[in-house]
Regions:
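Glycine-enriched, solvent-exposed interface loops adjoining structured elements
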Residues: 1-233
Length: 233
């Protein structure tokens, strides 16, 4: 379903319950709440070890990987092992128990996958001559780092990103500034499967309605606290 359609569905449900001249919400306001609900629903599935539908994932292809100095690496590469870093920060990936929800990082030509690793694991790996040169990746400070005997200049990543728009707008070797300016975000496919998106629309609308009513109560209470001054004349 297109993002514009999802936002419109939320707005329609919201407007039915909120009878006010101020009931029209901005698309950005709806989108931000929708992201919160989407992340919560997907995280719940992940924690319960349920399969996450492929529709929820996004793939960023043609990620430019650049050579960096050893002191720029979160983990020093082993002997005969090279390391490259993405030129730009990767859009934030959803996490589950401190693990990034990434399906894969792989080459775009041969489809060779890189294994996930972390800083502590790399310390043990570097001391093993049989596994030190194996292709691995990690995310550090939102950058993608790739280790291995031969790390290509271009990689692709498939993951559950917190903000789908940021994933679509990510600058790659396959994109251009002109193309980025021409993206109509409301026409992009919102990465959620059909069953879950219905739930997300309902929850997003309900939570926005609750916020509206809370704000109305706060305004009413503030008005009631204003002292009445009787003038004598």
């Amino acid at each position: 379903m297109k993002l514009g359609e999802v936002i419109q569905r939320v707005q329609s449900l919201y407007s039915r319950d909120v009878q006010s001249d101020d009931s029209r919400l901005s698309s950005r306001h709806i989108y931000n709440k929708l992201l919160t609900v989407r992340t919560r629903l997907i995280s719940q599935k992940s924690k319960q070890k349920q399969k996450i539908n492929d529709w929820n994932y996004q793939t960023i292809s043609c990620i430019e990987m650049i050579d960096i100095q050893p002191h720029e690496c979160p983990c020093a590469p082993a002997v005969n092992c090279t390391v490259k870093r993405s030129r730009y920060m990767i859009p934030k990936v959803m996490t589950d128990y401190n693990n990034n929800l990434i399906d894969y990082v792989m080459t775009i030509d041969s489809g060779d996958k890189f294994d996930f690793t972390n800083k502590s694991e790399m310390l043990h790996i570097n001391g093993n001559k049989y596994t030190a040169s194996k292709r691995r990746y990690l995310i550090d400070n939102d950058y993608l780092f790739a280790y291995g005997k031969d790390v290509p200049q271009i990689l692709q990543i498939r993951a559950l990103f917190e903000d789908p728009i940021e994933a679509v707008k990510f600058t790659t070797l396959c994109s251009s500034e002109v193309n980025e300016r021409c993206i109509d975000i409301f026409d992009m496919e919102f990465p959620m499967d059909g069953d879950t998106i219905d739930i997300a629309v309902q929850l997003t609308s309900e939570e926005l309605i609750v916020l509206f009513k809370q704000n109305m109560e706060d305004v009413s209470n503030d008005t009631g606290d204003i002292p009445v001054i009787n003038s004598k004349g």
